[in-house]
Amino acid sequence: MKSLLNRIILCSAFLAVASGLSFTVTSRIYMDVKHNKKPVGRITFGLFGKLAPKTVANFRHICLRGINGTSYVGSRFHRVVDRFLVQGGDIVNGDGTGSISIYGDYFPDEDKALAVEHNRPGYLGMANRGPDTNGCQFYVTTVGAKWLDGKHTVFGKVLEGMDTIYAIEDVKTDTDDFPVEPVVISNCGEIPTEQFEFYPDDFNILGWIKAAGLPVTSSFCVLLIFHYFFRQLNMYC
């Protein structure tokens, strides 16, 4: 009985992994954030370098080296929309009107990255003004935002620090979604890492097995009880 139960759970787990979406994280970037000069926390992004190599290269370069002497350090989160996203990275003008990249003012979308669905919080994507207008600005979703699907290059996801993202989301803004008090990237850098497969936050196979174990076991116990009583009835019929 125990062997059969284990096989069912393992088989279900295998099917879940086979059908589950995963991303190859090729590098990790962190950003430290301050609100009105007070530390808020750190965000750690896992970047999808195989899915969006050009976009990841641009983002990493701006973080680590900058363009024309300017990196993301000191730049603001200039757009904060509750229950939607936080947006930053305008290292040109600081207000969402500027654009620059290692490829020029703009660079094209990457088709595979356009196909990623914004079905949960924490996705890192390129802000744009339309197709093929990627530059330096990026956003992080705070909810599932399916209306962005197919319109933006998704190139990473928050691995740690969603509490920091939500803290940014909670700051007071004006009527143009611009924070009243500055929300600034005070530091950023790279965390050495070997590439690994990353499953979205709500897909946790170990947690699924733990969660499934008790219900499946309970179901089998109920079936065994019914089976026992049916056998007893047959003995007296």
Curated annotation (Swiss-Prot):
Its EC number is 5.2.1.8. GO terms for biological process: 'de novo' protein folding; intrinsic apoptotic signaling pathway in response to endoplasmic reticulum stress; N-glycan processing; protein folding; rhodopsin biosynthetic process; visual perception. One of its GO terms (cellular component) is intracellular membrane-bounded organelle. It comes from the Eukaryota. Expressed specifically in photoreceptor cells. Glycans are attached at residue 68. Residues 1-20 form the signal peptide. GO terms for molecular function: cyclosporin A binding; peptidyl-prolyl cis-trans isomerase activity. The chain crosses the membrane at residues 205-225. It is a single-pass membrane protein. PROSITE patterns: CSA_PPIASE_1 (PS00170), CSA_PPIASE_2 (PS50072). Disulfide bonds: none annotated. It catalyses: [protein]-peptidylproline (omega=180) = [protein]-peptidylproline (omega=0). It is found in: Membrane. Residues 30-190 form the PPIase cyclophilin-type domain. InterPro entries: Cyclophilin-like_dom_sf, Cyclophilin-type_PPIase_CS, Cyclophilin-type_PPIase_dom. Keywords: Glycoprotein, Isomerase, Membrane, Rotamase, Sensory transduction, Signal, Transmembrane, Transmembrane helix, Vision. Belongs to the cyclophilin-type PPIase family. PPIases accelerate the folding of proteins. It catalyzes the cis-trans isomerization of proline imidic peptide bonds in oligopeptides. Acts on the folding of rhodopsin RH1 and RH2 (but not RH3) and is required for visual transduction. This is Peptidyl-prolyl cis-trans isomerase, rhodopsin-specific isozyme. It comes from Drosophila melanogaster.
